[in-house]
Amino acid sequence: MFQQVKTSEPSLCKERLETFRAMRGMTHSVLSTKVLHSYLGDLKKAEAEGRNLLTEKYARMDNRIPPLKTNRLIDDIVRLESRWMKELSQKYPHSLGAGSGNFELYLSCELETYSDETLKQYFSDVSRAMKEVRNLAEERYTKLFQQIGYSSIDEMDRNRSLID
């Protein structure tokens, strides 16, 4: 789906497909099997209907089309995920402190492409993490940075502080 997305500006992710895959993998790496199975169903359904969910997401981000869905869980998920991202940006200012300005818009538009069932399962994962005092964003970035050779976000942040 991603390769078919037409953008008005060049996309670094489209030029570096491995970066796109790493970021998508990071995003999904902390979600339950229930969420992933439901989302796979969303992707298969969209493909059968001739829809490209990524095209729809980016069209929403550019405000080219009206909202795809209204579901209170979208706002709830975005609020909780944003809280986690804010915590990370304060904790790791050199590696995660900047560039998150569009996070809420990006996530909201992404979630609009999910089915109600996938949103329900995703919210369940986020709620469980909150009760367990876990930060899913931190878990995602830990996995990503470990993939590229760092032992932790803290190590990445220390290295970035030497550059800044």
PLM regions: where:
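Short, structured motif recognition centered on aromatic/hydrophobic residues
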Residues: H28-K44, L73, I77, L111-V126
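Extended non-catalytic interaction/regulatory regions in multidomain proteins
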Residues: M1-Q3, T7, D62-K91
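Long, low-complexity acidic/proline-rich regions
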Residues: L80-D164
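A cross-kingdom feature marking solvent-exposed beta-strand/loop segments within repeated
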Residues: T7-L31, Y39-D42, N102-L107, L111
